[in-house]
């Protein structure tokens, strides 16, 4: 089953660059993690200090909860601000679309 794990941090704007660097370094090291298809780092378009990590998983399991990687990331980030850690199950999609430009 495909699912997504989202870790969202609301921190001070001056802390955001170091958090982004840490997350980017982290996701480059996640290659080969069983079940992890992709990991992406996002920032809010209008709110400085809002950062999120999206990890897309494809695993065979019956109970969906935070991953070990996600729990480690959340533990490391919680000292920087307000943290939200959620798991979402995919229930539908409209195919693969590539955007260029």
What is each PLM-predicted segment?
Residues 1, 37-49, 74-101:
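Glycine-rich beta-strand-turn "strand-cap" elements at beta-sheet edges
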Residues 3-6, 15-21, 50-53, 95:
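Generic detector of short, locally flexible boundary/turn motifs and exposed helical patches
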Residues 4-9, 40-67:
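Short, well-ordered beta-strand segments in beta-rich or mixed alpha/beta enzyme
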Residues 8, 27-28, 62, 93:
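Intrinsically disordered, low-complexity regulatory segments enriched
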Residues 8-10, 85-86:
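Secondary-structure boundary/capping motif
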Residues 12-14, 58-60, 92-97:
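Short coil/turn motifs at secondary-structure junctions
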Residues 13-38, 68-77:
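Short amphipathic alpha-helical segments
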Residues 19-22, 34, 53-56, 66-68, ...:
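Surface-exposed beta-strand edges and their flanking turn/coil or helix-capping segments
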């Amino acid at each position: 089953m495909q699912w997504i794990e989202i870790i969202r941090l609301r921190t001070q704007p001056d802390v955001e660059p170091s958090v982004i660097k840490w997350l980017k370094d982290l996701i480059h090291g996640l290659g080969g993690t069983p079940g992890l298809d992709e990991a992406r780092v996002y920032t809010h378009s209008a709110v400085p200090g809002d950062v999120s990590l999206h990890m897309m998983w494809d695993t065979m399991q019956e109970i969906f909860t935070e991953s070990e990687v996600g729990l480690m990331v959340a533990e490391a980030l919680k000292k920087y601000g307000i943290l939200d850690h959620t798991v979402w199950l995919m229930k539908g999609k409209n195919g693969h679309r590539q955007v260029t430009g």
